[in-house]
Amino acid sequence: AVEEFLTHYADGRETWLDGVRAYARAIYGKVLARNDRRRFLDKTPRYSMIVPELSEIFPEARFVILLRNPLAVLSSELRTYIKGDWPLLADFAPDLLEAPARLVAAREVLGDRLCELHYEKLVEAPAEELQRLCRHLGLPWEPGLDDYSETPAPRGRFNDPVGVHRHRRPSSDSLETWRELGRSAQTRAFALAYLDALGDDTVRAMGYDPAALRAALLHIAEAVAVEAEALHALCGDESLDGQVLSRLAALRDGVHD
């Protein structure tokens, strides 16, 4: 209906584009003026769904896409938001299932207006990656730009609820936490199914090796099985079993040696 209205009573799609641009100028312009700034960074995972539209609306804008190991993304969502409440996963289906392929497709849409970063490189060599980003954006590099400890956190709920407040700079502490997905049969099967749903072509296009990710999950499963066998052997002796149970009970009750 909107398209027909614009076609018959205005200048078609260009009228709609002008309207959206005017809306954005009003909103972002007020924020910039109030904070005495010249540039505005707007970031949300859901923008992956409308990259072509954003490119058309803002033809001079620069775009930054941050890619991450898809299993690390899955692990983060499960730990941060789902927390065992599995029906909540439906709310994150677009981010988990659709966004990766759309981000890959954005390369063709955005061309040289796109700067692509990988999370792993960013946390391991933040200064180098941020210098590359600054060059793309035409911004001067300032030493210490990777130290965000003095930067005020965004007001409201629009920030990282878990990790960012624990560090002064990008940290690699969480690089390997995704491997925990391999420790239980349920999460391991879910992670493997997730890789299948994304498709190997998409995972590779993101810069990751799907075969290596699957192998890592299975290797962790084998290690867990060895641990279980060792524990079973330890507890097979009745006296040792009693000692183990007593120790666990003491730890539960806060009793320490």
Question: Whereabouts are the PLM-identified features?
Answer:
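Residue-level detector of alpha-helix boundaries and kinks
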Residues: 9, 39, 87-88, 118, ...
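PAPS-dependent sulfotransferase catalytic domain
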Residues: 16-34, 48-49, 53, 57, ...
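PAPS-dependent sulfotransferases, especially Golgi type II membrane carbohydrate sulfotransferases
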Residues: 104-107, 135, 139-257
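PAPS-dependent sulfation machinery
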Residues: 1-42, 47, 172, 194, ...
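Alpha-helix initiation/capping motif
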Residues: 8-12, 118, 142, 184-187
